[in-house]
Design a protein with these regions (language model features):
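Residue-level preference for the first positions of well-ordered beta-strands
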Residues: 58-60, 88-90, 152, 179
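Inter-Walker segment of RecA-like/P-loop motor cores
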Residues: 100-151
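Walker A/P-loop
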Residues: 56-76
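Conserved SF1/SF2 helicase motif Ia
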Residues: 80-100
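Conserved H-loop
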Residues: 66, 94, 185
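ASCE P-loop NTPase helicase motor core
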Residues: 108-110, 152, 160-233
Length: 275
């Protein structure tokens, strides 16, 4: 990041409206990773570049803790919003505070570009851009997910989002033929995130894994300590494995593999004595 961009961000106080947009500061570049480099001075890693430039409608990211998934998705969302007028991007997470982090990142990047912006429909965690596109966060419940029509649905910490909330999100992108981006660290071999990650029959998904080995700044001493003290947790948080929770006697994935869904049910009425 250049000194000028740093100073611009340091002087920003998250005002409701920033100075007028300066066109040359925000060039229209169709390739997101190139735009991030030129407009934001954001240098993506090879894995982040893959995420930014993926054009698919279905994207699922299996990421280590502190890998930077929120930041890279904020960059990707802002690029989509700036380059596609009048689209809505909805962000949901297990807590509204977590979803708000993505919005905060978006606002930070918009401030770097001196983009005029305001809240969308007076929502607390939102940003509306001059071209009419909006990015907003919603709470983790089916009631608030229903009724939104969006072009991109972003689900952060998707491994801990409840199934009924997932079910409520899908209609929001049906009319627009919208995109669905899921990002999370695993949380056991259960739930929609686990199912979508493993079931290739669920459509054309781009699946990207980013372990701690893709994090250049990871503290090796901390990794070794957690690996020795909490090996299962280290496998999950750092190496993106769907680990069985400690203390559980039966592995649901194992049960699923041994169940034969082709067996027809027994007609018990045949064996009942007639009066």
């Amino acid at each position: 990041m250049t000194i000028g961009l740093k100073n611009r961000l340091n002087n920003w106080r998250d005002s409701e409206v920033t100075p007028p947009h300066i066109p040359e500061v925000c060039p229209k570049i169709d390739v997101p990773s190139e735009w991030a480099q030129q407009a934001l001075a954001f240098e993506p890693s090879p894995k982040q570049k893959q995420i930014l430039d993926d054009p698919g409608h279905r994207l699922i990211l299996n990421c280590a803790r502190q890998w930077g998934k929120t930041t890279v998705i904020a960059v990707k969302a802002l690029h989509e919003a700036l380059h596609n007028p009048k689209i809505n991007i909805m962000v949901l997470s297990r807590t509204k505070q977590q979803a708000a982090l993505t919005i905060h990142k978006v606002r930070e990047f918009a401030a770097l570009l001196d983009i005029k912006r305001r809240r969308y429909q007076s929502r607390e965690h939102s940003v509306e851009l001059p071209n009419g596109s909006a990015i907003f966060a919603i709470a983790h419940n089916a009631a608030t997910a229903v009724g939104n029509t969006v072009h991109i649905a972003v689900v952060d910490e998707a491994a801990v989002v409840e199934d009924d909330v997932f079910a409520a999100i899908l209609p929001s992108i049906a009319r627009t033929k919208g995109k669905l981006w899921l990002l999370s660290t695993p949380s056991g071999p259960t739930g929609m995130f686990y199912k979508i990650w493993h079931d290739e029959s669920l459509g054309n998904w781009t699946r990207i894994t980013a372990t701690v080995d893709d994090v250049a700044y990871a503290d090796k001493e901390v990794l070794q300590l957690e690996t020795r003290l909490f090996p299962n947790r280290a496998d999950q948080d750092f190496y993106c494995k769907f680990v069985q929770p400690a203390g559980r006697l039966v592995d649901p994935a194992l049960l699923e593999r041994v169940v034969n869904h082709n067996i027809e049910p027994i007609d018990l009425d045949r064996y009942r004595k007639k009066p």
